[in-house]
Amino acid sequence: MSKRILYKDQARKALERGIDVLAKAVSITLGPKGRNVVIDKKYGAPQIINDGIAIAKEIELKNHMENTGVSLIRQAAAKTNDVAGDGTTTATVLAHAIIKQGLKYVSTGSNPISLKKGIEKASQFIIQKISENSRPIEDVKSIIQVSSISAGNDEEIGSMIANAIQKVGKDGVISLEEGKSAITELEITQGMKFEKGYISPYFITNSEKMEVVLENPYILMTDKKITLVKEDLLPVLTLINKTNRPLLIIAEDVEKEALATLVINKLRGIVNVVAVRAPGFGDRKKALLEDIAILTNGQVISEETGLNLETITLDVLGQARRATILRDSTTIVEDKNQQAVHARCEQLKNQLLIAKSSYEKEKLQERLAKLIGGVAVIKVGAATETEMKEKKLRLEDSINATKAAIEEGIVPGGGTALVHISANLKQWAKINLSSDELLGANIVEQASLAPLHKIAENSGKNGSLIVEALEHKNFEIGYDALSNSLVDMYDAGIIDPAKVTRSAIQNAASIASMVLTTECVIVNRDKKNN
């Protein structure tokens, strides 16, 4: 296929047009009075969402040049989502503001490399100030406030997530399930998460989230490598095929021919199967497999137990209510074998008492925490499928934001922290930077006002007047869009996780710098022009 090549201003203008399209669609959702976006799906009902990254993923433009701009700014949202789990709309608004202002300077002769250096230095200054001004999150009230805001100012959901985190801990597993009624409920159940994911991406059932979800699966656990198709795999696949239930295989490894057989079975719809490598090493691997076996009421197939894959029967397989497998983790939810799990926990506590080395104690405590901690399951209730999808997206954002707040603390929300820090940045840049680097820092200083500006605009107010009203106010004073007044953001419960704000400015500056230093764009020709 022939290529289309654009240079200099022409290239940057084409990228800018695509960036404008995505930023406009995403930014209308920002703030408590932000609007929704309706997305027409190829299959099923249209989806109503106000989640930045979900909207960004849906935008594809006909013009390949402009679509490259869309892809670039989408990265700012995606990276922020990967690191902090929220703040994708803020990252998009910031990146767009830096790019728009930066391109004006580039077109009038400023050096893009010097601008980039200024942008990087300014973003590092802001990140440092966010860290200095963040408050540790210490009480349940603050947790509820963070989770409520990220869930679209829904206090009921905020309380539920705070309750879930209290019960399973900040590192605990919170799983979302589709409920069977219109009411959203929280259930604490037994389960376990371990740090191993699917061996092959061909097992994925949800390509949007890159995950595999198995409902009511059988679980095969073995400390052996699965290598032979006829001896190791066919017996269990034949058994599972008759049950019409999915299968999760946890093994030392699955070698090429055997893995290919599993993938073919999966793709052809014969058996819904996924394979993951067993967690841990050596004796610890065997112990962890035994823990999983006790949780799921199954047995580990190994030489020590006298069981083998050729003569396997259904009664040695474990069972679970649900299994969710990501690229690097697996979560199993099961609550029917409570007595055996409790006995196993007591056994581990006794082993802890006699353990001699600190390493051994640490590993035993890890295993105990996995079994005792359990899994918080939020059953999402909704009247329609469209509402269900929208609610699940809000809950995911809320869970991620709350965990981020516990990790790095909180700052005033609603774009307030960036507005106050931008005033400090202006003074610092005047003293420490010069020429085009100073211009780069000024770009970031102006862009830092953009999130609050957009929140005010979405509330029907003049963004410039709101930003001006915050000048010379204390750090905690900000704009409450719901009441249209200046308030103490901590007292009002309008707070953001510091990690989310930090990630948003960091990724926005990174992507914007790349766009500003672009001198040539090469894309495939549009079909109609080919």
UniProtKB/Swiss-Prot annotation:
<dbReference type="GO" id="GO:0016853">
    <property type="term" value="F:isomerase activity"/>
</dbReference>
<feature type="binding site">
    <location>
        <begin position="86"/>
        <end position="90"/>
    </location>
    <ligand>
        <name>ATP</name>
    </ligand>
</feature>
<dbReference type="InterPro" id="IPR002423">
    <property type="entry name" value="Cpn60/GroEL/TCP-1"/>
</dbReference>
<keyword id="KW-0547">Nucleotide-binding</keyword>
<dbReference type="InterPro" id="IPR027413">
    <property type="entry name" value="GROEL-like_equatorial_sf"/>
</dbReference>
<dbReference type="GO" id="GO:0051082">
    <property type="term" value="F:unfolded protein binding"/>
</dbReference>
<dbReference type="GO" id="GO:0140662">
    <property type="term" value="F:ATP-dependent protein folding chaperone"/>
</dbReference>
<keyword id="KW-0150">Chloroplast</keyword>
<feature type="binding site">
    <location>
        <position position="414"/>
    </location>
    <ligand>
        <name>ATP</name>
    </ligand>
</feature>
<feature type="binding site">
    <location>
        <position position="496"/>
    </location>
    <ligand>
        <name>ATP</name>
    </ligand>
</feature>
<dbReference type="GO" id="GO:0042026">
    <property type="term" value="P:protein refolding"/>
</dbReference>
<dbReference type="GO" id="GO:0005524">
    <property type="term" value="F:ATP binding"/>
</dbReference>
<keyword id="KW-0067">ATP-binding</keyword>
<dbReference type="InterPro" id="IPR027410">
    <property type="entry name" value="TCP-1-like_intermed_sf"/>
</dbReference>
<protein>
    <recommendedName>
        <fullName>Chaperonin GroEL, chloroplastic</fullName>
        <ecNumber>5.6.1.7</ecNumber>
    </recommendedName>
</protein>
<feature type="binding site">
    <location>
        <begin position="480"/>
        <end position="482"/>
    </location>
    <ligand>
        <name>ATP</name>
    </ligand>
</feature>
<keyword id="KW-0143">Chaperone</keyword>
<comment type="subunit">
    <text>Forms a cylinder of 14 subunits composed of two heptameric rings stacked back-to-back. Interacts with the co-chaperonin GroES.</text>
</comment>
<keyword id="KW-0934">Plastid</keyword>
<feature type="binding site">
    <location>
        <begin position="29"/>
        <end position="32"/>
    </location>
    <ligand>
        <name>ATP</name>
    </ligand>
</feature>
<dbReference type="InterPro" id="IPR001844">
    <property type="entry name" value="Cpn60/GroEL"/>
</dbReference>
<comment type="function">
    <text>Together with its co-chaperonin GroES, plays an essential role in assisting protein folding. The GroEL-GroES system forms a nano-cage that allows encapsulation of the non-native substrate proteins and provides a physical environment optimized to promote and accelerate protein folding.</text>
</comment>
<dbReference type="Pfam" id="PF00118">
    <property type="entry name" value="Cpn60_TCP1"/>
</dbReference>
<dbReference type="InterPro" id="IPR027409">
    <property type="entry name" value="GroEL-like_apical_dom_sf"/>
</dbReference>
<comment type="similarity">
    <text>Belongs to the chaperonin (HSP60) family.</text>
</comment>
<dbReference type="GO" id="GO:0009507">
    <property type="term" value="C:chloroplast"/>
</dbReference>
<keyword id="KW-0413">Isomerase</keyword>
<dbReference type="InterPro" id="IPR018370">
    <property type="entry name" value="Chaperonin_Cpn60_CS"/>
</dbReference>
